[in-house]
Amino acid sequence: MADRIPVIDLAPIISGDPGAKIKVAMELGSAAQTLGFAVVAGHGIDPIIGAELRDAALRFFDFPLEEKLVIRRPKNDQNRGYIPYGEETLVRMAGGSSPPDYKEVFAIGPDNIPDEPYFTGPGSYPSFAPNLWPVAPINLRSCMLAYWEKMEALMRTIHGYKKMLPQLKIKKRDPFKESYLLAIWSTMSDSKDDVMI
């Protein structure tokens, strides 16, 4: 087990360094096999995209509860819409019980689902449920989709380098089945701390 989270720098690949691909692949493989995740740096994504999303998310979470509940998640097995405090407890995944996670969530899936039976037929739920968008802030949708697009491209890049290591058993990804959450954790005093994307 790693004693610290690895930081993997993609800048040499982006700059075209021919020797960097295998080095990055090895670092990604090591992170996947030891800790299970890593911090990726040097990815070239404009930090303004994340800053604009964070600002829009904080404004959304600051709205009164009644306004957020207009787009409340319709069913517990569906990661779409607003999920208020008290509905999720991470420890339940391991069969335990505890007080609910002290967070609120806004969740979406892909916004460009093809109009084909695989995506629209009876077996498509909940993976392809429609997104629920708030009326305000007006830019939340565009900010989330811009961020999604950049993260999806980055994920394809990372996934491609991990495939260079045959010892890793890489599962085929279906990008249409991904979900994307904005979460805000609060202190016990109920003031908003920060948004996690």
Where does each model-flagged region fall?
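Peripheral, non-catalytic segments flanking oxidoreductase cores
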Residues: M1-I197
